[in-house]
C-alpha cells in the first residue's frame, strides 16, 4: 500500500498529460471522430494533447487547425521529434517522425459547446416533427 501511495505522490506533470492524450491514426477513424473526441477531452481536462506518427501527422495537424479555426482551441505547445520504431522484435529500428500538439480551451469554448449542443437538439426535434 505504501508503494502505491508513494507512486501517486511522485506523479509528475507528464503523467497527467497521458490521460488527455489522443493518439491519432490516419486509417482507423474518420477525421471528425478525433475532432469531437478532442472537444470532449478539453471539456474534461481543459486541454488535450494530440500525437501522431509518420503519415498520421497530416491528420493531427488538420484536427488541430479545425479546432483552432472554429474557435474551440488555442495552441499551447508543438513538439516534433523522431522515434525509433521496430516492425519486428529483432528487426532494425526505423526512425519515424512524431508530432505532439498541446491545445487548450479558448475563453468562449463553453459557449461554443453549448451553442453546438443546442443546434444539435434543435436539429433532432426538427427531424421528429
Indicate residue ranges for each PLM-predicted region.
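Short, internal active-site loops enriched in acidic
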Residues: 54-56
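Short glycine-rich phosphate-binding loop at a beta-alpha junction
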Residues: 48-52
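Long, charged, low-complexity intrinsically disordered regions
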Residues: 1-45, 58-129
